[in-house]
């Protein structure tokens, strides 16, 4: 390609942990594909920073969840976006890659695109799940979309947006057959009764909303299934400190609280109770029966209900096109209902076998060597803009 020996400058913006994972995967592919002296900079997290990325701002500045909750952070977020836009327009990069974070990136990308900077967006917003005019924003903002799921490019191309299916890096990372026994040994849980992993979220606000309900459900499950053991992974030391009082308030529970080992905890489990999010896809790739739940503040929930039109929110159900695992959301997420549904997932062997087949097919469809495919797509976009 024309730029084979020419150093490049690629700006990237990721706004939350899932975007940091995707960004790190993409950076790995770009380091292999583009000249060694190329520079990568913008907004990202620790995974991106670990692969030679210069984070001008930490992604935590953007990681705010919920419509109402974001209001108090809007001034700072707008200030950061304005400053980044000025920097990029003053010294245009060879390409800009917005990694998810559509509210932030779709407000930035049109100006960059208008200035002739190639704009690539990694992770198609859920245009297939939500009402409204997101597709119009995409048309204005994006030169090329990198899609995680195979049905997305066709939807985008109908609207005139170039798109490439690149798969999901988690499908490349996670083995087709999880080592449950090895994970239990790693967590100090080699013998004994069944194990349920409980994941109440990766943000303080999520844990504060649904954590007490999950722990009450765990209490009921232990009463109904004596010998059951629980493992609860905390994403950070701060979240572990937030979860510890819940553990202390339920002294009869057989629970292991871990830090930063969510995938190991899920691998060790026979069933999972999980707050909705990317982690549900991870649970599916690990071939685990699960119950998906969430609670958000009432007003946020009302807005989400009016905007959504798919009957499900969990990625395993969205990818399957039907309910393959139960979802208990908002006021339906009672301790009793969560306990019953999770124990059903634990005990139903026929359902476990069926889910293993469904999730294996899902895994194979998403295993596409994402880092290489995404990097090649970015390289093609850059090359298409270079003088011949």
Swiss-Prot record:
Entry's family note: Belongs to the LpxB family.
One GO term describing the cellular component: membrane
NCBIfam families in the record: lpxB
Top-level taxon of origin: Bacteria
Catalytically driven reaction(s): a lipid X + a UDP-2-N,3-O-bis[(3R)-3-hydroxyacyl]-alpha-D-glucosamine = a lipid A disaccharide + UDP + H(+)
Pfam families cross-referenced by the UniProt entry: LpxB
Gene Ontology MF term list: lipid-A-disaccharide synthase activity; phospholipid binding
Keyword Cell wall biogenesis/degradation: no
UniProt entry keywords in alphabetical sequence: Glycosyltransferase, Lipid A biosynthesis, Lipid biosynthesis, Lipid metabolism, Transferase
Pathways per UniProt: Bacterial outer membrane biogenesis; LPS lipid A biosynthesis
Function: Condensation of UDP-2,3-diacylglucosamine and 2,3-diacylglucosamine-1-phosphate to form lipid A disaccharide, a precursor of lipid A, a phosphorylated glycolipid that anchors the lipopolysaccharide to the outer membrane of the cell.
Broadest EC class assigned to this enzyme: transferase
Coiled-coil ranges (or none): none
Protein name: Lipid-A-disaccharide synthase
Record bears the keyword Metal-binding: no
Organism annotation: Burkholderia pseudomallei (strain 1710b)
EC id: 2.4.1.182
One example of a Gene Ontology biological process annotation: lipid A biosynthetic process
